[in-house]
Curated annotation (Swiss-Prot):
This is Large ribosomal subunit protein uL16. InterPro entries: Ribosomal_uL16, Ribosomal_uL16_bact-type, Ribosomal_uL16_dom, Ribosomal_uL16_sf. Part of the 50S ribosomal subunit. Binds 23S rRNA and is also seen to make contacts with the A and possibly P site tRNAs. GO terms for molecular function: rRNA binding; structural constituent of ribosome; tRNA binding. GO terms for biological process: translation. Keywords: Ribonucleoprotein, Ribosomal protein, RNA-binding, rRNA-binding, tRNA-binding. GO terms for cellular component: cytosolic large ribosomal subunit. HAMAP family: Ribosomal_uL16 (MF_01342). The keyword rRNA-binding applies.
Length: 141
């Protein structure tokens, strides 16, 4: 699973996920991308499931870029634990994904294969997504 090697502080507050993404709203590396249409947390397990489904669909051809990384720790208290006694232990890691962010990119394969791989990846995610294509500055593909 993806997780940071080390962090300055083990635990974080939950925060809010509002607004649009500040960057990464265009496809930069590949030819096709999977864009988030809602804001949400994406867990490390969900990212890995998407990666595996894309790798199996592409069958060792083309390239995959993952543009999100789970760097936010999520804590939870044990079942049957009473209130108080401090914050719970770190249970997993999530990536904060805002609306409009391109999460995954694929390049080096034909259009049908890329779309099929991104559709499989989108089915593993808890948010609505859209498949987007890369546009050059001149307006041509």
């Amino acid at each position: 699973m993806l997780m940071p090697k080390r962090v300055k502080y083990r635990k974080q507050q939950r925060g809010t996920v509002r607004g649009m993404t500040k960057g990464a709203s265009l496809v930069h590396f590949g030819d096709w991308g999977l864009k988030a249409m809602e804001s949400s947390w994406i867990t490390a397990q969900q990212i890995e499931a998407c990666r595996l489904s894309m790798v199996r669909t592409l069958k060792r051809t083309g390239n995959i870029w993952i543009n999100i990384f789970p760097d936010k720790p999520i804590t939870s208290k044990g079942i049957g634990t009473r209130q108080g006694k401090g914050k719970g232990d770190v249970e997993g890691w999530v990536a904060v994904v805002k609306k409009g962010r391109v999460m995954f990119e694929i390049g080096g394969v034909d259009e049908a294969t890329a779309k099929r791989a991104l559709e499989y990846a989108a089915s593993k995610l808890p948010i609505r997504t859209k498949i987007v294509q890369r546009y050059e500055i001149g307006g041509e593909l």
